[in-house]
């Protein structure tokens, strides 16, 4: 009898890229739904435009490279990138912002480096930074939460603002009663004007609590989605735990040392894109460290950078910059923190 000798692995597990992407997209849907509830249909429209742009851009690049189109589009990595860009952009921002950002993410950051698995930076965060430095006013003017808006904007109103030139011009100037700064931006501005954190938190945008109106529930929804990813073993805990833990510890020290000039740990954890970053952005396996201890350090680095940028930097939310800086350090982390050889105990 002839025996066939095959190389390892001898036991295989079905973990196709498309299945992983589907689970991540599914886990992000509660956060998307809560964002739409508080900030209107604009978020949903931005996501739809981003997805259509991502698929078209990737198909065009693949055709130019003489690569098969259908298998690459079916892995849904472009859809996930587009989803992350769509939820990160202000809901009523002009349509060309999401188109520019998505094309840059897919063409320049992903395909120019060789496609899926070859990119050095997180495509969604690279696109966000490009838009932030190119259109700072548009990217920092968010729709007012539905609980604070003077009037409720329907889907047709959102389409009119996003796609019409007049609506885009009005949005750039700030539509009275419809658009406003984010809680992070409001707190940062108030602190620079000499107000205490406690005085700033009394503004209507904070909803009378310790977090921004609506943003607590958005972050809680992304946290629930992240727990689903952990439960299904789609992601491992190291990066998320390192990020949340480091941000909590830094916030605790800052708040304990000077509560008048520093936000509380609860505010930092449930404001901005903290939970989205912890479970859906920083955990990108392509641009993160690979070893367990390396991933823990990678996540902690992002958490510390988020806190430093939010507290001392020029931007209210430092998630995108923190992730990109950590992406740069990922190869260095892998070089110095190597996984234990198989058979050793004590690895994380």
UniProtKB/Swiss-Prot annotation:
Q: Where in the cell is it found?
A: Cell inner membrane
- PTM FMN phosphoryl threonine: at which residues? 182
Q: What keywords sit in the KW lines?
A: Cell inner membrane, Cell membrane, Electron transport, Flavoprotein, FMN, Membrane, Phosphoprotein, Translocase, Transmembrane, Transmembrane helix, Transport
Q: Which residues cross the membrane?
A: 25-45, 68-88, 124-144, 211-231, 237-257, 263-283, 296-316, 317-337
Cofactor dependency? FMN
Output the Gene Ontology cellular-component terms: plasma membrane
Membrane topology listed for this record: Multi-pass membrane protein
Translocase listed as a keyword: yes
Q: Which Pfam families match?
A: NQR2_RnfD_RnfE
Gene Ontology BP annotations: electron transport chain; transmembrane transport
Which EC main class describes this enzyme? translocase
Name the Enzyme Commission number(s) assigned to this protein. 7.-.-.-
Q: What is its main location?
A: membrane
Q: What is stated as this protein's family in its record?
A: Belongs to the NqrB/RnfD family.
Q: Its quaternary structure?
A: The complex is composed of six subunits: RnfA, RnfB, RnfC, RnfD, RnfE and RnfG.
What does this gene product do?
Part of a membrane-bound complex that couples electron transfer with translocation of ions across the membrane.
Q: What is this protein called?
A: Ion-translocating oxidoreductase complex subunit D
């Amino acid at each position: 009898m002839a025996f066939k000798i095959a190389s390892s692995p001898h036991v295989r597990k079905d973990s196709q890229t498309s299945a992983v992407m589907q689970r991540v997209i599914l886990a992000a849907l509660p956060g998307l739904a809560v964002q739409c509830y508080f900030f209107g249909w604009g978020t949903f429209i931005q996501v739809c435009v981003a997805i259509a742009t991502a698929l078209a851009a990737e198909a065009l690049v693949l055709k130019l490279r003489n690569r098969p189109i259908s298998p690459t589009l079916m892995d849904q990595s472009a859809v996930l990138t587009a989803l992350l860009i769509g939820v990160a952009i202000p809901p009523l921002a002009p349509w060309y912002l999401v188109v520019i950002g998505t094309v840059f993410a897919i063409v320049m950051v992903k395909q120019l480096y060789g496609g899926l698995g070859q990119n050095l930076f997180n495509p969604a965060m690279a696109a966000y930074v490009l838009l932030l430095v190119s259109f700072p006013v548009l990217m920092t003017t968010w729709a007012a939460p539905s609980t604070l808006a003077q009037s409720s904007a329907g889907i047709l109103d959102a389409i009119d603002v996003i796609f019409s030139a007049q609506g885009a011009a009005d949005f750039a100037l700030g539509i009275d009663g419809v658009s406003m700064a984010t809680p992070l931006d409001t707190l940062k501005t108030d602190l620079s004007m000499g107000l205490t954190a406690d005085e700033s938190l009394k503004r209507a945008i904070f909803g009378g609590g310790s977090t921004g109106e609506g943003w607590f529930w958005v972050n809680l929804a992304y946290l629930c989605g992240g727990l689903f990813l952990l439960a299904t073993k789609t992601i491992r805990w190291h990066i998320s735990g390192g990020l949340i833990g480091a941000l909590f510890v830094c916030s605790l020290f800052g708040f304990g040392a000077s509560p008048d000039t520093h936000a509380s740990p609860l505010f930092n954890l449930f404001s901005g894109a903290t939970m989205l970053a912890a479970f859906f952005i920083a955990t990108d396996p392509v641009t993160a460290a690979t070893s367990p201890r390396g991933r823990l350090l990678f996540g902690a680095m992002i958490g510390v950078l988020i806190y430093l940028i939010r507290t001392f930097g020029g931007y209210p939310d430092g998630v995108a910059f923190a992730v990109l800086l950590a992406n740069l350090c990922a190869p260095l982390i892998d070089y110095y923190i190597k996984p234990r050889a198989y058979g050793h105990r004590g690895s994380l």
